[in-house]
Amino acid sequence: MLADKVKLSAKDILEKEFKTGVRGYRQEDVDKFLDMIIKDYETFHQEIEELQQENLQLKKQLEEASKKQPVQSNTTNFDILKRLSNLEKHVFGSKLYDE
């Protein structure tokens, strides 16, 4: 998924060779900078993997919670009806249910 969008990997950066010219860049500076970029790429890659795993886990939890929710709702409705029935018996007496 992400590999399709990213053009360079940490390995590509590490293995990149630069041609030197008469007045080219200092090799040491280029290497240090590339090392920083490689570390950043590795950090970003690791963070992305962790976030994708967390995202997958949260989606599974959401799916499980949404499956359980209707059962809880039905139970709650049943409990409410039962309590209402008991209150009616108490308020109106048993005459309401004897008829």
UniProtKB/Swiss-Prot annotation:
InterPro entries to which the protein is assigned, alphabetical: Cell_cycle_GpsB, DivIVA_domain, DivIVA_fam
Gene3D superfamilies in the cross-refs: 6.10.250.660
GO biological process, one term: cell division
Compartmental location: Cytoplasm
Pfam annotation, one family: DivIVA
Coiled-coil annotated spans: 34-71
Keyword set includes Cell division: yes
Alphabetical UniProt keywords: Cell cycle, Cell division, Cell shape, Coiled coil, Cytoplasm
GO CC annotation: cytoplasm
Domain of life: Bacteria
Subunit structure: Forms polymers through the coiled coil domains. Interacts with PBP1, MreC and EzrA.
UniProt family annotation: Belongs to the GpsB family.
Function: Divisome component that associates with the complex late in its assembly, after the Z-ring is formed, and is dependent on DivIC and PBP2B for its recruitment to the divisome. Together with EzrA, is a key component of the system that regulates PBP1 localization during cell cycle progression. Its main role could be the removal of PBP1 from the cell pole after pole maturation is completed. Also contributes to the recruitment of PBP1 to the division complex. Not essential for septum formation.
NCBIfam families named in the record: DivI1A_domain, PRK14127.1
Protein name: Cell cycle protein GpsB
Gene giving rise to this polypeptide: gpsB
